């Protein structure tokens, strides 16, 4: 049984005079099964960290700790949790979609975290469905602001890429001041001359390695390696050694590397194609055999009759 995640945020989605209730649920979760603690190397006991006053060294309980803003060196003003909760920020309860843009206009570097957007209850379903359909047909994303996790975020709300999914997607975005200038970092790259033959080979290599994107094909190999390490420790066996890739020979230049890469892809494609062809022939042969056997049985029945 799948345990449904609880809403992370609930409030109103507003477009001009249209307003209805929605809930946001995080679209991602951590699947890591390996969690490390800090332990003492000699005793193996877990190390605990205490929060202490710097002058007296006296430990402070969590219930006695509040946030503080340092307005001068070593001087703070306390800020209670209630003070933050009572901030008069409209986006804490309402996402007001201020403008709509084509989804492709949003720079992928702006995206932070995805959320599923659902109608808050059955009475909100009609308005939700109308807005969702309009976003899907126009290919637009609504841009607004939302207060989450102690700060305000830009948020883009759009229809999912799969039309069979009847919800909406929300993506928190970074503000302009959070983005580093790409021009500043790329300015030192010189526009080198591109060799037409090298470009042709690079295009061919990309084309041969192109396929439909399937996220399930990619696995977290680092997590797997950590699991092997932990299992080896538990069983008191030698630690698994990392396989070193065998050298493929010295690459003379870019042209040579491109040609060899395209050649390897050609060989791989032929190998896969041959295996698939043999599999199809084997399958057809088995089907013919079944037909022959089936026919033999019917002949026997006719003879016995």
From Swiss-Prot:
BP terms from Gene Ontology: DNA recombination; double-strand break repair via nonhomologous end joining
Pfam families in the cross-refs: Ku
GO molecular function: double-stranded DNA binding
Start and end residues of each stretch annotated as Disordered: 263-305
Signal peptide feature range: none
Keyword hit for Coiled coil: no
InterPro entries: Ku70/Ku80_beta-barrel_dom, Prok_Ku, SPOC-like_C_dom_sf
UniProt keyword terms in alphabetical order: DNA damage, DNA recombination, DNA repair, DNA-binding
Record carries keyword 4Fe-4S: no
Biological function: With LigD forms a non-homologous end joining (NHEJ) DNA repair enzyme, which repairs dsDNA breaks with reduced fidelity. Binds linear dsDNA with 5'- and 3'- overhangs but not closed circular dsDNA nor ssDNA. Recruits and stimulates the ligase activity of LigD.
Subunit and interaction comment: Homodimer. Interacts with LigD.
Official protein name in the record: Non-homologous end joining protein Ku
Organism expressing this protein natively: Acidobacterium capsulatum (strain ATCC 51196 / DSM 11244 / BCRC 80197 / JCM 7670 / NBRC 15755 / NCIMB 13165 / 161)
Organism taxonomic ancestry: Bacteria, Pseudomonadati, Acidobacteriota, Terriglobia, Terriglobales
